[in-house]
């Protein structure tokens, strides 16, 4: 069976240049964060919604003063334009960050497929440095857009499932984006329409290794797929593939997350933190590499 490596922003913790979600929000908002909010998307909304005074999309006069209409409302371009400005700023920040060396190790795995929630194209660039042919199978939706990597008869695919920095408008961020996107994911699951052309098919029908991906409660698109898969296994009595989640043990919700994932028919491998993410990810790499031999 083919193998998929699914990774998130956790691998960018290796090295000095990685940017956390919190730091990214601080960079684009210039506003103090409300750290007690557990949800990533709610933290985003709590900062972005009050940004009318600093968003470039707000219309101003030549003195920098906000323009007000006859009813006292701030004049601005469309909400879509404001959102694009924010996404463009995110893309610019991520584009300036030097990639973690761990992308070299991911490329060394030679997996059939790579799926990432990250916006940057670091893995694509890594394959390009190896003189491999890279073709973009373009689509308006991150559900179907992907890159095909080929060399010497070997082929892999890379999917940035939450959009990418080359097309900032494709970036999935905030509640509206996640809700709309998850609705489309669920439609694919229920109707099977274009299933085989989307990354969703890889989670259901290839062996999947998940690393560097916190699977926060608000990652509702991925949870929807995992719940759907677990229900299908229960109803049919058949399991098409194996999903392995590598959980780094820092003592926070390890037991509860492990139990939940195992109930959803996901195998969990607990990795000791060992004082650094680097040591933990070295162990994960060896585990995946050994499994794929």
Where are these regions (language model features)?
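SIR2/sirtuin-family catalytic core signature
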Residues: 1-36, 81, 130-135, 145-154, ...
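Active-site glycine-rich loop that binds ribose-phosphate moieties when present
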Residues: 140-146, 173-197
